[in-house]
Regions:
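Substrate-binding cleft of extracellular glycoside hydrolase catalytic domains
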Residues: 39, 43, 50, 54-184, ...
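Hydrophobic membrane-insertion alpha-helices, especially the h-region
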Residues: 15-35
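N-terminal Lys/Arg-rich, disordered targeting/topogenic segments
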Residues: 1-13
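Catalytic domains of cell-wall/extracellular-matrix polysaccharide-remodeling enzymes
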Residues: 158-229
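N-terminal hydrophobic targeting segments that direct proteins to the cell envelope
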Residues: 31-45
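Functionally critical loop-and-helix segments that line ligand-binding/catalytic clefts
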Residues: 43-66, 71, 213-264
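Glycine-enriched alpha-helix->loop->beta-strand junction motifs that scaffold or abut catalytic
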Residues: 76, 94-95, 125, 211-218, ...
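Flexible, glycine-rich phosphate/dinucleotide-binding loops
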Residues: 107, 136, 204, 227, ...
Length: 264
């Protein structure tokens, strides 16, 4: 005797049903990842981020030896603070660019530069190299040291950066500006690109000549402010205590606009 075949009832999944399933899968993924994240990031809250900017960038050196490049992201909580906790995050943005320390003075090389440089490029993060300037050293030697360490730049790489933070012993404000201009002109002539100048808002006001600030893109450091105290700036380093997912500890965090980043 043939058994009567039972009809299988078709289940129709609506758009709302698909959304619910996706939300459930996402919640399960968070639950699985949660212990791992908590174990790695005990202190998960960092600086408050400024409003109105959409391109985040980091600047790194030997002090950030271990970076999970494929995981890099800036997460903020409900109060606008950076966080490493995915369960507290209400907004997530990618890290769009990274400035990497290459050299200092006339002979020092950052031991993690080449590794960071390679990994940033490999993971599609726009990269730039910076030189920490020493006003007590020969400017042309410093420029050549930077050029030899960094090597050629691709079209997608950011312009070279001159990091000016102090007037070193044995030099003056006048000497610093004269030497900085030699470095900038030497590097610009070599790469065919106008370098960026990094400094704090107060140092720019007190020490840098208009010949520098009016003719080169400015990357300004100014913490704890709604906007930087600098008339002409392209990139703003707004904190040195940010939490960035993929980096243990605190890190410098910067903002700019998409258009500015595109034009550099």
């Amino acid at each position: 005797m043939k058994r009567k075949r039972r009809k299988i009832k078709k289940i129709k999944i609506t758009g709302y049903g698909l959304t619910a399933i996706f939300a459930l899968l996402l919640a399960l993924a968070v639950l699985i990842a949660k212990p791992h994240i908590k174990e790695r990031h005990l202190d998960d809250r960092g600086c408050k981020v400024p409003t109105g900017f959409y391109c985040y960038g980091i600047d790194i050196s030997k002090y950030q030896p271990d970076i999970e490049w494929k995981s890099l992201m800036v997460m903020t909580d409900a109060k606008g603070h950076t966080t490493n906790s995915i369960t507290k995050a209400t907004d997530i943005k990618k890290v769009s660019y990274a400035f990497i320390k290459a050299t200092e003075g006339a002979s020092m090389k950052d031991k993690y530069f080449h590794n960071h440089w390679k990994n940033a490029g490999k993971h599609g993060i726009r990269r730039g190299a910076y030189h920490f300037f020493r006003s007590s050293k020969d400017a042309r030697q410093q420029a050549m040291h930077f050029i030899q360490t960094v090597g050629p730049l691709s079209e997608n790489d950011l312009p070279p950066v001159l990091d000016i933070e102090t007037i070193h012993k044995g030099s003056s404000r006048k000497t610093l500006n004269e030497k900085a201009l030699i470095w900038l002109e030497t590097v610009e002539n070599h790469y065919g690109r106008k370098p960026i100048v990094y400094s704090s808002a107060s140092f720019i006001e007190k020490n840098l000549y208009k010949e520098i600030t009016d003719n080169y893109p400015i990357w300004v450091a100014h913490y704890g402010a709604e906007r930087p105290r600098c008339d002409k700036w392209h990139i703003w380093q707004f904190a040195d205590n940010a939490k960035v997912y993929g980096i243990d500890g605190e890190v410098d965090l910067n903002v700019t606009t998409e258009q500015t980043l595109k034009n550099l």
